[in-house]
Amino acid sequence: MSFFLSNLTNDSNLWKASHNSTETDLMNSPATLTLSLFCLICIMTLAALVGSIFSLVSLLTMQYRTVLSILVTSWSVDDLLSVLSVAIFMVLQWPKEAQGYFQSLCTTSALLYMCQGLSSNLKATLIVCYNFYTMNRTVESQSSSWRLGQVLGVTLTVWAVSLLLASLPLCGWGVFVRTPWGCLTDCSSPYVLLLFAVYASAFGLLAVLSVPLTHQLLCSEEPLRLHANYQEISRGASTPGTPAAAGRVLCLPPEDVEIPALRCTGGCSPSSDVVFAPGQPAASGAGAGRRENPGTPQGTNSFPLSLAQKRFSLILALTKVILWLPMMIHMVVKHVVGFQSLPVDMLSFLLSLLASSVTPVFVLSKRWAHLPCGCIINCQPDTYSVAFDGKKSKRKGFEFNLSFQQSYGLYKIPHADCYDDDENSISYHNPKNYECEATKEPWGDNRSVFNTITVEISTTPPLDSATLTGVHKCTNTDIPESKQAMKEEKGAFSVKTESDINYGETTSFEGPERRLSHEENQKPDLSDWEWCRSKSERTPRQRSGGGLAIPICAFQGTVSLQAPTGKTLSLSTYEVSAEGQKITPASKKIEVYRSKSVGHEPNSEESPSTFADTSVKIHLEVLEICDNDEALDTVSIISNISQSSTKVRSPSLRYSRKENRFVSCDLGETASYSLFLPTSDPDGDINISIPDTVEAHRQNSRRQHEERDGYQEEIQLLNKAYRKREAESKGD
């Protein structure tokens, strides 16, 4: 022991490069390594070793690997290089006299340490750039996605560049020196300026991109469960609660997406992280991992997990780069002014070594999906967590079917107290064959209500619908993979409910446009209507650029069929407050016929006959869809829309069960929804056209103002017809 301590406190044979020679002086030691410093370095090295091994094992055993997880895995390899470098230097403290191999070992130690330092900082910038790109890339770039081979290629390129820069002293530019705490670069060489230039460039780019990312990921004005990617939903992305049983094909599985991104403006289209399944060949890239395997967490926990990965990776990137900042600044100061301080040198080295110990924090994102939190992000468990943890949480005796006519399509979102064998899935049953006793009676009691009701959609289809390939049928049956492509058919989309409650439909499929399609005489499940695109639905690249500044505000023109009884048919709207944290007003029950479908409040200073640029106010009812037992059945939302152009559509929303909320979809064309309700008197049939433009709201408001009490909106007429139908059925 005394032999070891004497080496530490007396002559440690540390190297110092001679300024007059390119050879290293092996016998001169500028300072000594104290026992406390030696123990501290050993502890930090051991912590970095354990952490890097833990990170590698955890990340390599992930069932679904994302781009971020692969990049962080390479970070762990850099940490191992750092551990190896410091371990080599620690070995050099043992011999009492310098050996012939000391110079080679010290050079190797310095080379590895500088290589991993450069690689770690460059990858930190790369990770931040990737996060910024995926959350802000334009719609036109949606078709391009990172493949596994590309990710590995970028990682190897960073390592190659780092090794090239670190090996320049071996080529005669700069030298490595031995210090009391490690083998590092001689600060008197101009080589230091090159290192600082590379680091400063990476740090500058990281700092610029981190400002908006920090706001989006840590200080976002949106709620924690941010709204889903519109492009992902419009492509038919599967959502939590969708049955994942074998042989069951969902509506166009997601394009290797892991998370819905955050809100962005200026025409950007938030994108999602790419998932690589185990054993996926590099050449197949994003297209190979499209199918969800039953029982995997990808369909249930992917959103909060991937969002947490982005948050943790951002924090780790900033941490690593900042921990290297003191060393880089000190090296430049020493080179420029010749300032030298052993305590500062030691502190900067320890901080750079500490940067190799923080990588395991990324693995915690799997368990701390709601962290890190900051600003206004709520760290407490929220009502949305039930939808993401895959647990069975049943409502107390309440179930309904919610049918949406929106964005040129009809969507039915069931919510029942029936669950299949998959613990992560909610079972959706055919409306004519409900397995829940609670739904059999309403359908039987109200069969007459649906005997002759026809709901049709009249649209003006766009001329440039986007091309989409790899379409799966929206069916719930076992079908071979070779038959997953849609069949092209001509016809009109309609849903008819007849006396035997059979649903018959014909679909339209023109060119690349997707339509709902079913095999002949096949009786679809309710899941057939989940996130299936209709013929004329807008595609992301056709979105109008004239939307409102705030994507989440309101929508109108959506028809909602409430409850299996079908007694009421109402327009629905939804609004999140400006801060995105709560819904106003408070949840309460409102009778549909008392609510205003669309309304207009002109400026009191203006003439009643003039309708300039004012706000359109909508008072409507929407069913709240969540697994919270304490939640009320309905909420009433008030929405305000202000548009400068009378012809521009106001934003629309669609419901996302994955988010348990409505999400924005900005549409650029006008559409109207036609409802035909036959009565016993052929002359009394009601044909209602519900427009959804701001101008239509103003016209309705003008009519309401002019006709006063005599004016009735379409929804009021429809409810009156339902009440009349109900009275006739009771009279019979």
Curated annotation (Swiss-Prot):
GO CC aspect terms: plasma membrane
Basic and acidic residues bias spans: 511-526
Cytoplasmic topological domain ranges are: 58-69, 134-156, 212-311, 365-732
Disulfide bond annotation, renumbered to this chain = 106-183
The record, for InterPro entries, names: GPCR_Rhodpsn_7TM
Q: Does the keyword Cell membrane apply?
A: yes
Chief location: membrane
Which residues are glycosylated according to the annotation?
7
Q: Which GO terms describe its biological process?
A: antral ovarian follicle growth; negative regulation of ovulation; preantral ovarian follicle growth
Q: Extracellular topology: which positions?
A: 1-36, 91-110, 178-190, 333-343
Q: Which GO terms describe its molecular function?
A: G protein-coupled receptor activity
Q: Where in the cell is it found?
A: Cell membrane
Known CDD domains for this protein?
Answer: 7tmA_GPR149 (cd15011)
The function of this protein is: Orphan receptor.
- Please report the name of this protein according to its UniProt entry: Probable G-protein coupled receptor 149
Q: Which organism is it from?
A: Mus musculus (Mouse)
